Amino acid sequence: MKKIRHYYLAAVIQSALLAVASPVARAQDATTDGYVTRKEYEELKAQMLAMKKELDAIKKEKGAIPKQESAEGQAIVDMHKEVAPPVVEPEGPMLGTTKFYIAGWGEGMFEARNGSVSTFSASFNPIFLWELSPKLLFESRLEIEPSGSGTNVNLVYAQLTYLLNDYITLGVGEFFSPSNVFVERFEAQWINKLPDRPLAVYHGILPNISVGAEVRGGFPIGPTRANYALYVSNGPTLNTFDPRTAGTLDFSSYTDNNDDKAIGGRVGFLPVPGVEVGYGFEPAKPGFQGTTFAHVRSLVQSVDLDVTRDSDLLKGRINLYAQYAWSKVDHAVYDPDGSLGFGPLAFTSKRDGGYAEVAYRPTKMDTDFIRNLEMIFRWDHLSRAPSGLGAPEEERWTLGLDYWLSPSTVVKAAYEWDNPRGERNRNALLLQAAMGF
C-alpha cells in the first residue's frame, strides 16, 4: 500500500511541475500567431506517455493483491478438506434423531379383607415410548413390585406399531386384547377410579394380553364415528387337570398349545360425542394338540358402554363404564378314565360376568376442595366355575371416594361388600395413592 501511495504522489508532483513549466516554455517560445510550437507538442506527448505507464503499473500491482488473497483462501479450504473430510449422513435413523419418552405410574395400597391378614403393597409401572420415525413406534411396559426378599419384574406388553395411514394402524408383539376395554383403557391405577379391578373382565372370562399381530383404526360415518380392532394371536388354553378350573380358559398362554390361532376383535360405535358402545369377540380352539380336546372350540363375546357427560344441573361430570362378557366351551368329558380323581365329568362350559361403574365429580363447584372430590359406585359379578367344583358365584358392591391432588395424582378410599355364594363374606377396606407421569 505504501508503494501505491508513492506512485500517486509522483503523478501529482509531475502534474504540478508541468503546470508550472508550461507558462515558462510558452513565454520563451511563444509565437505571435497563438499556435503551439512543435517542441511544446513533443514535450506534452512525452509527459502523457510517462504518466500512462505509471498508471498502468499501479493498476497491475493492485490487481495482483486480490488474486494472492484468493489463492491463500483456497489453500486454507483445501487444507480443511484434507484434515476434516465431509460427513456422510446415513439413510436410516440415528440415535439422537428419534424421540424417546418414559411415562407410567406408581402406587401404594393398603388392603384389609375379611378372612385374610391386612397388608400393604406397592408397584411401579414404567412405560417406554420410542418413536423411530413419524410412522414407526415402539411401546413397552414393565411391572415392578416387591415379592418376599426380592423384586418381581414382569413384562406386561411390548409392541411395534406402524401407522399405515389415518385409518389403519398395524401392530405386532404382545399387546392388550382389544376386546377387553377395561384392561386397554382403564387398567392404569391413576385412571382406574377404585383401588381394585372388577371381576370377570380382569380375571375369569376375557383375555387380558394377546401375543400376535393386530390391525386397528377409526373412521367417520357422517356425523358419527366408528373404530375397529382385529387381531390374530396365540389362543387360550383349556384347563383340564384341576376339577376347580376344569372347562375354564387360561389366557396367559405366551406360547400356543396347537396350530390353531385365536382370531378376535372389537368394533366400537360413537353415535354422539361422549358415548361409545362396543362389541368384542374371540373364537379359538383351546385344547392341546393330539389329545381328545384337540377339536373343542371356544367363543368369548362381550359388550361395553362408555358414557361421559358434563352436567350444569349437577354442577359436574358423570362417567358411566360397563362391560359384560360370556364364554362358552364345547361339550367335553374331563378326566374320562378317572385317573385325576374327579371324573369322568362331562359338561358344556358356560360362564358370564361383568361390571357397571358410575362416578360423579363436582367440577363446576366454586370450592377447590369439593371440586377435587369424586364419588364412585361399582357393581361387579362373576358366575360360578362351570365344573361346579370350583369358585362359587360372586357378587360385589363397592363405594369409593377419591381426592385428586393433581390431574394425574389421586388418593382413594373404598369399602367393598364381597359375597361369594355359600361362603362367608370377604368384605374389604381399601386405601390407595397413585400417581401417573
PLM features per residue range, with description:
Residues K2, P23-V24:
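Periplasmic/cell-envelope proteins involved in peptidoglycan metabolism and beta-lactam response
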Residues K2-V12:
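Bacterial N-terminal signal peptides that target proteins for export
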Residues A10-V20:
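Bacterial N-terminal signal peptides
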Residues V24-F110:
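N-terminal periplasmic/intermembrane-space "pro-region" immediately following the signal or transit peptide
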Residues V88-L238, D259-I263, G268-V277, D352-M365, ...:
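Outer membrane beta-barrel
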Residues A158-L163, G171, R185-N192, H203, ...:
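Outer-membrane beta-barrel pore domains
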Residues G204, S252, D256, F347:
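Glycine- and other small-residue-rich loops at beta-strand/loop junctions that grip anionic moieties
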Residues T240, T245-G290:
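Loop-centered beta-sheet repeat module
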